């Protein structure tokens, strides 16, 4: 009986391992590419941004610049190039040098930070591969969230990503992929908080 139990455990682990490897292989076939910026040697990215939070609407310029040892410098510019926010991002954490209290409320700041986290780092912690109707779904763990990318069958680039954790959900939409400085990236990105409280639309102006 002990021998049979050991054999059963070995077979279970073997098949789980095979399934995991198969999922990992399938998740990269055809080789997928994810909408991230400044991960292939690019030094700067500039977006035109529009943010909606309740009845409040704001237009601004979002500037991202590479610094030392993987650090990213972040600036938000308003009218007449006035600096509205200044921060750095490294290893998944933000450090703010300048952030007026009335620029973002708590929900809007959370959506803004989650947007940048997903656009500045490649997804790594693979969780699941699934084919559903005409879509391929590939999920990764990202901090406390599960990020699920949606690909149309045969496509290399995703058109949508759903970020979820319990009742906290966001939708990312990637539209109009174009070649910028040798890298294929979405020209427009829309991020919407599931309860409709906050939405951010980014239009890529340059990637160098």
Regions found by a protein language model. Give the residues of each.
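Gly/Pro-enriched, hydrophobic low-complexity segments
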Residues: 134-208
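N-terminal leader/targeting segments and the immediate start of mature chains
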Residues: 17-65, 70-71, 102-106
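Membrane-embedded segments
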Residues: 78-83
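Acidic/charged, solvent-exposed loop-and-adjacent secondary-structure segments enriched in E/D, K/R, S/T
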Residues: 94-126
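Sec-dependent bacterial lipoprotein signal peptides
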Residues: 1-18
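Short Lys/Arg-rich amphipathic alpha-helical segments
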Residues: 84-85, 100
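Extended lipid/amphipathic-ligand handling interfaces
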Residues: 62-66, 87, 174-179
